[in-house]
């Protein structure tokens, strides 16, 4: 079975590595074009490209795989199946109908919920108690094709974007190998999605990561953990913009302060008042500096009880 793999970030790269480790015949890899990063604007290869190079797999980075040279390169590979994981572009009919076994995507949500680019962050931000991995057959819609396999996992109160992404990546790799075994044996049965239950997970914008109001402790907790450890939620501290990490639920906090006011600072965390309830925060990042604990920030006289965040 000749596999063409399409993906771009580290989440996808881990799936590609698993395929190679399990001795699957990956005949080609498609990834988004390299992007300039850092002060020197040096072109950095995508994580998927790095893994493909490591194993000597041909890599293609066309502006579009749906037409022109990109599509011609794909046709020449004569894949039996295409697997996509966070590739970053919608595929047209001529692409997903090319391989005899079809074109399948590994998606980090329980479809039809959270179709789109940022399912992990949006699930956390909305306070979901569970999520999962769905492998589905690609059609002309966005994450709307029939489901081949799906498995759910619990979202714990300790999870943030980093920990949940790792859990889902491990589940995705396991499910992908299971899927390939089943499709090779002709054992895959497709189940149409219930489109009436669809929700969406749009791409993250800068505005999404800004925290203005400390209105509800649970909402603030979910927002901070949805973008922890990257890119971090930004809020105001006087004239500065700081990033907050390590949020926790403050169940038994006695709150009698203005929203955004720091009530207390301990070695573990600081408690910040909200209109409803409060939130614990353990780490903070000042502009141009490394992430430090709130206790280090207090010891360095960067924060103190009584000052306000937000606005």
Swiss-Prot record:
It comes from the Bacteria. GO terms for cellular component: cytosol. InterPro entries: Fmt (IPR005794), Formyl_trans_C (IPR005793), Formyl_transf_N (IPR002376), Formyl_transf_N_sf (IPR036477), Formyl_transferase-like_C_sf (IPR011034), Met-tRNA-FMT_C (IPR044135), Met-tRNA-FMT_N (IPR041711). Pfam families: Formyl_trans_C, Formyl_trans_N. (6S)-5,6,7,8-tetrahydrofolate binds at residues 109-112. It is an enzyme of class 2 (transferase). Its EC number is 2.1.2.9. Disulfide bonds: none annotated. Keywords: Protein biosynthesis, Transferase. Attaches a formyl group to the free amino group of methionyl-tRNA(fMet). The formyl group appears to play a dual role in the initiator identity of N-formylmethionyl-tRNA by promoting its recognition by IF2 and preventing the misappropriation of this tRNA by the elongation apparatus. Belongs to the Fmt family. This is Methionyl-tRNA formyltransferase.
């Amino acid at each position: 079975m000749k596999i063409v793999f399409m993906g771009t970030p580290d989440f996808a790269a881990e799936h590609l590595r698993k395929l190679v480790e399990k001795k699957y015949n990956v005949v080609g890899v498609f990834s988004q074009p390299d992007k300039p990063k850092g002060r020197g604007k040096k072109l950095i290869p995508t994580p998927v490209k790095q893994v493909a190079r490591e194993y000597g797999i041909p890599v293609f980075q066309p502006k579009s795989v749906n037409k022109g040279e990109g599509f011609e390169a794909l046709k020449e590979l004569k894949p039996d199946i295409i697997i996509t994981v966070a590739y970053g572009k919608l595929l047209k009919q001529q692409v997903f109908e090319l391989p005899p076994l079809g074109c399948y995507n590994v998606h980090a949500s329980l479809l039809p919920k959270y179709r789109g680019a940022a399912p992990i962050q949006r699930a956390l931000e909305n306070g979901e108690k569970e999520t999962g991995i769905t492998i589905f057959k690609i059609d002309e819609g966005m994450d709307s094709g029939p489901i081949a396999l799906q498995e759910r996992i619990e979202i714990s109160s300790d999870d943030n974007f980093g920990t949940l992404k790792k859990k889902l990546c491990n589940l995705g790799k396991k499910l992908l190998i299971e899927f390939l075994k089943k499709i090779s044996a002709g054992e895959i049965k497709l189940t149409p999605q219930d489109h009436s239950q669809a929700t969406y997970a749009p791409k993250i914008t800068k505005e999404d990561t800004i925290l203005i109001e400390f209105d509800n402790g649970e909402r603030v907790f979910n927002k901070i953990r949805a973008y922890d450890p990257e890119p971090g939620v930004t809020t105001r501290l006087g004239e500065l913009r700081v990033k907050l990490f390590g949020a926790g639920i403050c169940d038994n906090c006695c709150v009698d302060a203005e929203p955004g006011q720091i009530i207390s600072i301990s070695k573990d965390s600081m408690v910040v008042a909200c209109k409803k309830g409060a939130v614990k925060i353990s780490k903070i990042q000042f502009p141009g500096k490394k992430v430090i604990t709130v206790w280090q920030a207090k010891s360095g006289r960067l924060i103190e009880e009584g000052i306000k965040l937000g606005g």
